[in-house]
Amino acid sequence: MAINLYKTSIPSTRKGAVDSQVKSNPRNNLIYGQHRCGKGRNARGIITAGHRGGGHKRLYRKIDFRRNDKDISGRIVTIEYDPNRNAYICLIHYGDGEKRYILHPRGAIIGDTIVSGTEVPISMGNALPLTDMPLGTAIHNIEITLEKGGQLARAAGAVSKLIAKEGKSATLRLPSGEVRLISKNCSATVGQVGNVEVNQKSLGRAGSKCWLGKRPVVRGVVMNPVDHPHGGGEGRAPIGRKKPATPWGYPALGRRSRKRNKYSDRFILRRRK
């Protein structure tokens, strides 16, 4: 979808850039309310994830990540906005009367037909196992565990590439640059996730950020020593340390955060960038 630029009529909309209007008219049987509790706090009320709180109420759309309607073709009826993700979603009407939401593939328009199964064409929006795909296919919504549903490459503009198949495994290059092995029996959707221009979006003002449930980000150097290792000092003082630290005293800016000795390390051929 296109990006619309605000006219510079008032300061709050200067340099703002938003998505073109994609209406959302969700079906009642495909949505449900969710209780947003915590707002970044744990059971004792202590902040464990910063910069969270507030935000507009949302209805969760049930997305079909499994695509388990085998060999039943469906038609794209609507392309809708989803407040829970950057990607758009499509309402699919299947031939057996079933109606489901899926992630919007890039380039898909209303009226297109999609299908999932083992012997289906390699065309945009179709879902099939990796073993039936040719090398070099661009894919998204990739399963890690068989029949669990897609878990990889689901963000707006995300795309992975099938680069090798050997034995029982397929080798994928993920959007992060990581190269890893996945079972060839796992399914994926052909194509790239839509709304590629989302990285060009500029909210233009702090209030728009607040609607998303994101609170202001404050530098540690302007805090008190009790709140951050960088805090304290007279005036504009430096951080007073050789290297930056997180609010909890751990090394910041480049420290590996992945847990060591995970079972999935054996499947990662090259770490992400």
Curated annotation (Swiss-Prot):
SUPFAM superfamilies membership: Nucleic acid-binding proteins, Translation proteins SH3-like domain
GO molecular function annotations of the record: rRNA binding; structural constituent of ribosome; transferase activity
A Gene Ontology BP annotation from the UniProt entry: mitochondrial translation
Ranges annotated as biased composition (Basic and acidic residues): 262-273
One cellular component (GO) term of this entry: chloroplast
Source superkingdom: Eukaryota
InterPro entries found in the cross-reference section: NA-bd_OB-fold, Rib_uL2_dom2, Ribosomal_uL2, Ribosomal_uL2_bac/org-type, Ribosomal_uL2_C, Ribosomal_uL2_CS, Ribosomal_uL2_dom3, Ribosomal_uL2_RNA-bd_dom
Keywords: Chloroplast, Plastid, Ribonucleoprotein, Ribosomal protein
Primary subcellular site in the record, as a coarse category: plastid
Positions of region (Disordered): 224-273
Intracellular or extracellular location(s): Plastid, Chloroplast
Subunit organization: Part of the 50S ribosomal subunit.
Protein family (similarity comment): Belongs to the universal ribosomal protein uL2 family.
This protein's name: Large ribosomal subunit protein uL2cz/uL2cy
